[in-house]
């Protein structure tokens, strides 16, 4: 296995089955999105969109707690020891504690692409995505 990410596959079941060995080799788990390949793309975009919104909210949480004199490490520990113990919160939260913004800036550029794709997909579906509007203007 090359990496630990899951692979989202969309398309005709026979086509996915033909690719199964490759999909199993590159991901820890295969998620079947259905017969429409666009569904797999929507999942990928939505996944990164949610991550971008989470990073934005986390940054605001760090800013708020700093304004009240809370040490960033304390907020980080509270945040990642409970409901937000997921790797994304631990990795990006640690970058905020350490004020190592280079990684966050790099991810923001990549995240902006998917935020804009999510906004376009939402617009095409007649679905407003208010968090995405914030991400695309930051």
Regions found by a protein language model. Give the residues of each.
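Short glycine-enriched loop/turn motifs at secondary-structure junctions
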Residues: 1-3, 102-103
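Short beta-strand and adjoining strand-loop segment in the mid-core
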Residues: 2-24, 30-33, 46-54, 62-68
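Helical "substrate-binding/catalytic lid" subdomain
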Residues: 37-138
């Amino acid at each position: 296995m090359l990496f630990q990410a899951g692979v989202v596959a969309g398309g005709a079941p026979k086509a996915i089955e033909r690719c199964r060995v490759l999909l199993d080799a590159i991901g820890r788990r295969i998620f079947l999105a259905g017969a429409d390949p666009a569904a797999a793309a929507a999942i990928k975009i939505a996944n990164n969109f949610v991550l971008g919104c989470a990073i934005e909210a986390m940054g605001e949480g760090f800013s708020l707690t700093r304004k009240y004199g809370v040490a960033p490490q304390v907020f980080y520990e509270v945040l990642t020891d409970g409901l937000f113990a997921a790797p994304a919160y631990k990795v990006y939260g640690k970058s905020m504690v350490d004020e190592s913004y280079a990684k966050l800036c790099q991810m923001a550029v990549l995240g902006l692409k998917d935020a804009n794709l999510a906004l376009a997909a939402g617009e095409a579906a007649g679905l407003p995505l208010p968090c995405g509007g914030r991400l695309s203007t930051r």
